[in-house]
Amino acid sequence: WHELMGCKRGNQCELALSWLRGNNQNIQIWGMSATIGNIEEAASSILGLNSKQPKIIKSNLVKNIEIKSIIPNNIGTFPWSGHLGIKSHKSLLKEIDKDKSTLIFTNTRNQSERWFQCLRYFNPEMEDNIALHHGSLDKEDRKLVEEGVKEGSIKWVVCTSSLDLGVDFQPVDQIVQIGSAKNIGRLI
């Protein structure tokens, strides 16, 4: 739900939920998020103004989050599009464990494809353990990648934000964000 709050799609979703509530007073509405901080506000926007008290279920799970920035000593000529940060692949590879499940997020499909090719080129031994995932891939191809991660046969996935919506991987050991995250909720 955190992806919908405060944007045009979220407003459209709220209007649709309002219409559904108007047509069926007994409808049950569920909202879920693994990262949302303002649960009461989200519940209010999902359920509407004149709703019953929501039932909020929270996990007591505590996760240790380590955030580390990889910034090159010399930026040189800064690439403003497409191949953002690709020159820092060696620094990135020092941080990624080949045996750990890792999601490598980029902000665009083009970046994900470039990083995927770069990581494959510099890690031929990972050929069968690295995959690409973005919304423009065939649905069956995306499903194969998701199943490979869940089974453990795929260790690294270079992906766009299409992978952070509605996909639950157990466990993901590392997450890498190349470039700035679209928002702090996505980063965490």
Regions found by a protein language model. Give the residues of each.
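Helicase motor core with emphasis on the C-terminal RecA-like subdomain
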Residues: 1-188
